[in-house]
Amino acid sequence: MGVQSRKRSYFLTLMLACSGWISAQQGVLIEAESFTEKGGWLVDPQFVEQMGSPYLLAHGMGVPVANAATKVSLPVEGNYRVWARTKNWAPGNWAAPGRFRVLVEGDTLPNVLGIHPDWNWEYAGEISVNKAVVAVALADLTGFEGRCDALYFTNSRETPPASGSDLAGWRKSKLQEPLAPEITQTFDLVVVGGGIAGCAAAIAAAEQGLQVALIHDRPVLGGNASSEIRVHTLGIYGKFERILSKIDTEHYPNGSPDAILDQQKRDENVKRYPNIHLFLNWRAFHAASQDNLVQFVDARPTSGGESIRFKAPLFLDSTGDGWIGYWSGAEYSYGRESVYQYGEAWEQWGELWSPEEPDNAVMGSSILWRTKIANTGKAFPAVPWAMEVAQSHEATAGEWYWEFSRNDLHQIEDGETIRDHMLKAIYGSFYNAKQNPANANYQLEWVSYLLGKRESRRLIGDHIFTFRDVLDGAAFADSVVMEVREIDVHFQQQLQDERQPDFLSKALFYKTGKYYIPYRSLYSRNINNLFMAGRNFSCSHVGLGGPRVMRTTGQMGAAVGYAASLCKKYGVGPREIYTQHLKEYMDLIERQQWNRP
């Protein structure tokens, strides 16, 4: 063999060796929400846009939950380093409250997880694998909100990226996800958000013959009225009693298990419509517009799986947070306007009602909870990590005024911080109450882990509903929603009395007569095929104070559903219903009040 041939052979051997080494450096990413057995862990998709993914939450109210488990296929035998993406949600000079461990083939990995602040990868330990498929489990150690986003098995020394676009791209690569959904489905109307407003819109449109996609990121419908959050519905039916009575609630105490019966009624009634295509446990993650028209909404299952691109000539944003509008470039507002912008003063309450200068303060979010009285006493563990919030406050139940908002916190971007703050308030206040012997037999029965939001983004329509509209009390030519409920705006009690906990609010009630909301507040002024209904409708901060309750937002949804039917009939957008077909639309709305349940 000549020198040149020997060199070629040497380099070929070296390249093959390197190729083999590279192929052996392999990693497997397992999304925790995709575990086949969730055990007592819950899928929490509330904060995907901030931290990157749904995650598993060990919401045991102080009692460790059953293990989550799955099978993991590994590409080669050998040693693997195991990482978990997690977070210590209450860092401080105490043991982290959400601690857990990873088990592989029944063996507990050495490192306790959930101990470092902020979302990041924590090293669980190293394993030796001599089989293609291994059993993996998450073992909760506390019952206090441990959380796991994902596990990563790697036979290299790499550390996965922590957050942001680097993590998103890395995650997409590891999961081999396509750049865009490979499945497309087309409907007459796509409704994103299955609260009372979204359900009412879907029913109204379906009854008019439209094919409707209803996308909702929870296993049950109703939003704040669902059995998962348990707020009763307030407001009047307006002209839509037949539809709204199918999906509303009795006036049970907030947090009551009676919400479960109303949940069953709601789910059954929506599922009766064959042309409502229900996508429960699906979360929208992207929308795009072109020429001021929403082109599509992309959504995926909250427990993992193939995504779908939803197309339609019409879309309804009833997400509460205005996500479809936000992604597609719709104009929106957030926070409190200056008192001078719309003339919304209530002199008696000054800055607490409407500020001199605009700010980021909004009505806050709540977490409802309840206790039961058992036959025997049961201790509740010490929660030192909660006491900085609860301080000396004692309670054995929560109500609507357990609410948190702060000018430096954004109700969407800081949602997880706000939720966790409320959990600290609950656990700490209950611990304090348990120190009283009279409360020895009290036990936590139910604590929601889902934020009940009141206010965040408000999409802007052709008409912005304000306090002035309430004071005027005049009907519009396109009045489709009516209400008699007082305008109530919330503020934190600490603003009046520094001795009060920061998680309790107070409401200011402005008594009023009947007022009306025009159809023009229910479609975007710059995205020409986008409706909105619910608390993200077109209004000012004070204007939201009355009609944010759920029978009223349900009226909005029903009005949108009927408008969508005429949009289809004439091949026009939402605005043209007002400019070209208003009489026919209002006649259709008017007929609904005589169509009793």
Show the residue positions of the predicted features.
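Bacterial Sec-dependent N-terminal signal peptides
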Residues: 1-25
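Beta1/beta-strand and adjacent pyrophosphate-binding region of the FAD-binding site
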Residues: 183-195
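Flavin (FAD/FMN)-binding glycine-rich loop and adjacent Rossmann-like elements that form
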Residues: 176-183, 224, 285, 293-296, ...
